[in-house]
Amino acid sequence: MNTLDFLDKKSLRDDIPEFRPGDTLNVHVKVIEGSKERVQVFKGVVIRRQGGGVRETFTVRKVSFGVGVERTFPVHSPNLAQIEVVTRGDVRRAKLYYLRDLRGKAAKIKEKR
């Protein structure tokens, strides 16, 4: 094991569910405004997952009021309160960048049986 991996192991979270690109997630994000802290839910489709260890990130895409919104989260961030898998998607790619060009029903992902 690499020395950096040994040091990073303490920072890894163990409450992260198994998810892949194509899955629909509810990501509960801690938002700090002044002295108040609240949890905001970001629901969307995972379009990529990259990196490894502490530096692993994933990007979630949703369409809000006709505008595509993408947000990238570090998997092991302390600002993530919870990650829920809503549905499992059936896709053949690891990076779903092609969803950016699709609109309406064409942008839907089949649900895995």
Swiss-Prot record:
BP GO annotations: translation
Keyword annotations of the record: Ribonucleoprotein, Ribosomal protein
Functional note: This protein is located at the 30S-50S ribosomal subunit interface and may play a role in the structure and function of the aminoacyl-tRNA binding site.
Domain of life: Bacteria
InterPro entries from the UniProt entry: Ribosomal_bL19 (IPR001857), Ribosomal_bL19_CS (IPR018257), Ribosomal_bL19_sf (IPR038657), Translation_prot_SH3-like_sf (IPR008991)
GO CC, alphabetical: cytosolic large ribosomal subunit
HAMAP family in UniProt: Ribosomal_bL19
Protein family per UniProt: Belongs to the bacterial ribosomal protein bL19 family.
Name of the protein: Large ribosomal subunit protein bL19
Gene coding for it: rplS
PANTHER family: LARGE RIBOSOMAL SUBUNIT PROTEIN BL19M, RIBOSOMAL PROTEIN L19
Disulfides per UniProt: none
Pfam family, one: Ribosomal_L19
GO molecular function: structural constituent of ribosome
Organism encoding this protein: Rhodococcus opacus (strain B4)
